[in-house]
Amino acid sequence: MEMVLPVANATAAALARVSAMFNAPLARAVVFGIHIDGHLVVEGLLIAAILFQLSRKSYKPPKKPLTEREVDELCDEWQPEPLCPPIKEGARIEAPTLESAAGPHTIVDGKEVVNFASANYLGLIGNEKILDSCIGSVEKYGVGSCGPRGFYGTIDVHLDCETKIAKFLGTQDSILYSYGISTIFSVIPAFCKKGDIIVADEGVHWAVQNGLQLSRSTVVYFKHNDMASLASTLEKLTHGNKRTEKIRRYIVVEAIYQNSGQIAPLDEIVRLKEKYRFRVILEESHSFGVLGKSGRGLAEHYGVPIEKIDIITAGMGNALATDGGFCTGSIRVVDHQRLSSSGYVFSASLPPYLASAAISAVDHLEENPSVLANLRSNITLLHKELSDVQGLEIASNILSPIVFLKLKTSTGSAVADLELLEVISEKVLKEDSVFIAATKRSSLDKCRLPVGIRLFVSAGHTESDILKVSESLKRVAASVL
């Protein structure tokens, strides 16, 4: 400040002197009887100079055409940027090749293996009743639907499937999507727009992350499955902030987290939702057909009225042994998607035989509730057998069909951790014919939860299958870790 004041004062004094000089009697002139001050003369000259510059033609240097030799040299020197960045060695994926259906037992690279790498929770892959329904549907409708739902792609079996799912879950209506992961990342942007607030779990999988990004909403993450962190986040966003009262607000969670096998505490989430007036989007790809007394998902598991969940989505490729996905809820929620959800509007509809398979799978679940008891028995047995694996610990919930093993002591680097886990997976497959997989994540995946080995338990696994994978993991982990 001490330096600025003298400079400012000196500048003001200089301007005053210049102004006084131009307004002095000697600087005044009389033209045609009109008194003209000196500063008007200066301003007139400036205007004349500006007009002169604007009226001049722009200067263009003479162009000399390049010779053919110069053109060739420039072409030879040009180095185009690569279409995509080079793949790092650690990012290369050499996945085993399956040569049969991905049931409890499958063939990998010509060898029969026990399969714990595919989500086939109810063991319905290869089910005769489902296969017969698919064959009948192909004979009646053909293989594909040949168009989006709004353009001659709606077939009666699609409507039957939507009605079946809504009736099974006790919701007003449902809507089918042609691809599992496109369901959630189409539904989120259909409802969440720029300026809205989304509070999401930091452990959500890539498809949910993609939906959050496409929505262009303001996204705030809370600690993985931590209700204290969720409550704190909601409080910070709403306390004393009148702006948040006027915009849409959502909580986005998974029922069973693909990246950890943890189960979301829905009762507490609903309590916080009602307290802070948020809406809930629940992703149930790994809980539909699994959790609850009759497999109706997380709401049945916690005894929460399903009407309290605003939007529910799920893929049908995990429990129902088919493909595609669905969103269910109120009639208003479903109707909005028929014109606003990109995955529904712009994609060819679900092949009719896959919709028939979904209907048959739900029928099978209703007629054979014992399949859930078999699944839970297998999960419990696997947890018991893997409780003392050297260097590994179970991070998943006891009721989750995803049994997630992570390192007890991390190396400090996710890349190094993954390399160790991949070595274990490869040795288990090569030496004991047990197919398991480590959790690979792309550079676009924002999830920062620990990597691990993910085992998908099926009701179709036998006790000997469970014991085999347990013994193999114990032996290999002891030799590697």
UniProtKB/Swiss-Prot annotation:
Keyword Kinase (UniProt): no
Key words, A-Z: Acyltransferase, Endoplasmic reticulum, Lipid metabolism, Membrane, Pyridoxal phosphate, Sphingolipid metabolism, Transferase, Transmembrane, Transmembrane helix
Stretches that traverse the bilayer: 32-52
Coiled-coil residue spans: none
Pathway field: Lipid metabolism; sphingolipid metabolism
UniProt GO cellular component terms: endoplasmic reticulum; endoplasmic reticulum membrane
Pfam families documented for this protein: Aminotran_1_2 (PF00155)
Highest taxon above the source species: Eukaryota
Name of the protein: Long chain base biosynthesis protein 1b
Taxonomic source organism: Oryza sativa subsp. japonica
